[in-house]
């Protein structure tokens, strides 16, 4: 099973936001089922920015401690989740797909397709209309057999 994880799902788990319990259950299930997990390279960049902001503003980390913590989390993420890169063609498909109201979501979808994923898991299911891949929220995926 190949699963594409949207940025918000990965962040939920790694910075322990509101629904961390569901995110942890999701990651445990995917690990138990030996699922191949994927994210876009854009997700990685976005997460590094947001996690760094969280470390500074919410946890008050600065200097060497902050960067060491950020690097440690980055390594954990990259070891757990494979990164899908875009080529110009897949990015153009994402930009030109009029079914999506958000270009970023459309590019995420194209990354999932490029990785040959079976599912997309996101907290924003409504942002993925009319896709060929099934799109689940973490809680809905946990109920899926």
What kind of feature is each model-predicted range?
Residues 1-39, 54-60, 65, 130, ...:
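Short, well-structured N-terminal submotif of metal-dependent ribonuclease cores
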Residues 2, 110-145:
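Acidic, PIN/NYN-like endoribonuclease modules and their adjacent C-terminal/linker elements
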Residues 24-28, 71-75, 109:
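Short amphipathic alpha-helical segments and helix-helix/interface helices
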Residues 50:
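ABC-type ATPase nucleotide-binding domain
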Residues 66-91, 97, 128-145:
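Short acidic, glycine/proline-enriched helix-loop-strand junctions
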Residues 79-125:
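Active-site neighborhoods of divalent-metal-dependent phosphate/nucleic-acid chemistry enzymes
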């Amino acid at each position: 099973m190949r699963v594409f994880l949207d940025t918000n799902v990965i962040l939920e788990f790694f910075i322990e936001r509101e629904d961390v319990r569901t995110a942890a259950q999701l990651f445990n299930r995917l690990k138990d089922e030996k699922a191949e997990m994927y994210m876009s390279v854009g997700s990685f960049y976005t997460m590094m920015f947001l996690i760094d902001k969280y470390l500074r503003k919410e946890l008050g980390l600065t200097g060497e401690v902050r960067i060491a913590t950020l690097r440690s989390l980055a390594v954990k993420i990259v070891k757990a989740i494979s990164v899908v890169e875009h080529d110009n063609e897949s990015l153009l498909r994402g930009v030109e797909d009029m079914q999506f109201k958000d270009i970023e979501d459309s590019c995420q979808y194209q990354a999932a397709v490029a990785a040959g994923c079976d599912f997309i898991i996101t907290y924003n299911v409504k942002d993925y209309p009319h896709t060929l891949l099934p799109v689940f929220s973490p809680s809905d995926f946990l109920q899926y057999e």
